[in-house]
Amino acid sequence: MEKLGIIDKKKTVFVLIDIQDKFIPAIKDIDKLISNSNILVKASEILNIPLIVTEQYPKGLGHTYEKIDLPDKKYLIEKVSFSCFGSKEFIKKIKELKVNSIVLFGIEAHVCILKNALDALKNNLDVYVVADAISSRTAENKSIAIERMRQSGVFIVSTEMILFQLLDKAGTEEFKLISKLVK
């Protein structure tokens, strides 16, 4: 039976990938990516979903872009491989969190997002890539990356789609707070 993509917030981790200073000027639709990434970061706090933030070779590429409103409660992991799964620290954290779903957003769609999505699948995780919170230097690379991930079994979602899937129902305090975020 095919996977349905039903996600449980208690078994989910958000991973913000490589939204770093040196990448910012070259990335297509960067303002939308930053806006939606900030919504996801804030939602991770509201929904009590762990947030892992990665930085690709920060010594050369800078740290997480200052317009990303990172919470105090996050796990920051530096990496040199395109995939977080190349980091023992990342793998250890995923195992500690006991998650079965991973939500990916950040840059670049056709490099690090793609590699992480495929490696997460290989590690038996359900993978959700937030299409309106990823980008590349060209729209074509983003589009091809999304198609490639979809072919492999990744669930392609939007910011609002994943948040309301995680909420499950209206009328809660979480629902009210998330609704304010996406308006």
Predicted regions located by residue number:
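Active-site-adjacent betaalpha module
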Residues: 2-13, 59-183
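Generic N-terminal amphipathic, Lys/Arg-enriched alpha-helix
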Residues: 10-26
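Conserved residues at the C-terminal ends of beta-strands
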Residues: 17, 55, 105
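Active-site loop/turn elements of alpha/beta-hydrolase fold enzymes
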Residues: 19, 56, 132
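A positional/architectural concept
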Residues: 22-27, 31-53, 58-59, 63-69, ...
